[in-house]
Each structure stands twice: as structure tokens, then as C-alpha cells.
């Protein structure tokens, strides 16, 4: 009986550990009408082949009035991406089309909406500095945070 109990415990622990590990590759981020992300820092284990960001707009205002997106790039590229996003404007989704500096980006969403983006981490270097930010109407001035691979 003890052997069965031990095996059940090992099996249960293995299943829950794998589930927890898989969830480390997915991060939930929120933003509202107050021009801020719910977290200033995102860390993804370096062992994740892909990372997923689930992005939710918790505010009430529509995308045309207070929309947000979630964009990931090297920190050094943040301002140039924002500058090009300003040129693209609302019609271009506040991002230059097919910008190779953008690692990942969500659609622009408004209050009550959600979106997600999944991207490969293989091209990311743990030694580089990365930032996530919102390019809508230069929100990146205050809406930004750091992104890192850990481990």
C-alpha cells in the first residue's frame, strides 16, 4: 500500500510540476485607461521555446480613445520603433509595417477586450536588454517595462 501511495504522490507531483512549468511560458498582462501596465517586469524561463503574452484591456474606453497594444523589442529600438509608429498613426496600427525590430506585437485593443501573441524565444539573447511597451499615441513614454529570459 505504501508503494502505491508513493507512486501516486510522485505521479501527481510530476503532473503538477509540468503544468506549472508550462504556465511559466505564458504571462498575463493588463492595462487600463490609466496608461500603465499591470507589471513593470516580465521574466520568461530561457527553457521556453515559445512565450505567450495574454493581454487584457481592463479599462472602459474604446480603442479609438484609449487603445493599447503590447510590443516587444530590444530596449535600444524602443524609441525608433515609437517614432516610426507615430508616422504610421492609427491607420497603420501605430507600428511600421513589417518592422524587423519588432519581436512581437499584439493588435490594438480597447476597454474590455483581450488579445494574445505567441513568439519564439530562440532569437533572444539573455545578455541583451528588452522592453515591452505600448506604441499607441506615444504611450510608451509611460507604458513600458522590462522583459528578460531567466535561467
Where are these regions (language model features)?
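Sec/Tat signal peptide C-region and signal peptidase I cleavage site
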Residues: 16-22
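Extracellular/periplasmic metallocenter environments
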Residues: 104-151
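Bacterial N-terminal signal peptides that target proteins for export
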Residues: 1-8
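Cleavable N-terminal signal peptides
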Residues: 8-10, 20
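N-terminal edge beta-strand
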Residues: 24-50
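Short beta-strand and strand-turn-strand segments in soluble, beta-rich domains
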Residues: 36, 90-104
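Extracytoplasmic/periplasmic copper-protein system
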Residues: 23-32, 76-95, 137-151
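Beta-strand cores of secreted/periplasmic/IMS beta-sandwich domains, seen most often
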Residues: 41-65, 70-72, 116-125, 129-130, ...
Amino acid at each position: 500500500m505504501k508503494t502505491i501511495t508513493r507512486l501516486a504522490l510522485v505521479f501527481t507531483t510530476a503532473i503538477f510540476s509540468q503544468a506549472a512549468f508550462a504556465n511559466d511560458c505564458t504571462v498575463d498582462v493588463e492595462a487600463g485607461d490609466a496608461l500603465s501596465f499591470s507589471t513593470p517586469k516580465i521574466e520568461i524561463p530561457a527553457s521556453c521555446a515559445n512565450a505567450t503574452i495574454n493581454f487584457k484591456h481592463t479599462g472602459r474606453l474604446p480603442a479609438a480613445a484609449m487603445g493599447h497594444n503590447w510590443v516587444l523589442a530590444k530596449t535600444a529600438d524602443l524609441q525608433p520603433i515609437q517614432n516610426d509608429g507615430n508616422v504610421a498613426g492609427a491607420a497603420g496600427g501605430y507600428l511600421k509595417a513589417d518592422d524587423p525590430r519588432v519581436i512581437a506585437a499584439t493588435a490594438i485593443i480597447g476597454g474590455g477586450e483581450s488579445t494574445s501573441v505567441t513568439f519564439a524565444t530562440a532569437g533572444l539573447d539573455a545578455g541583451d536588454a528588452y522592453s515591452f511597451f505600448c506604441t499607441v499615441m506615444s504611450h510608451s513614454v509611460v507604458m513600458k517595462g522590462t522583459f528578460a529570459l531567466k535561467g
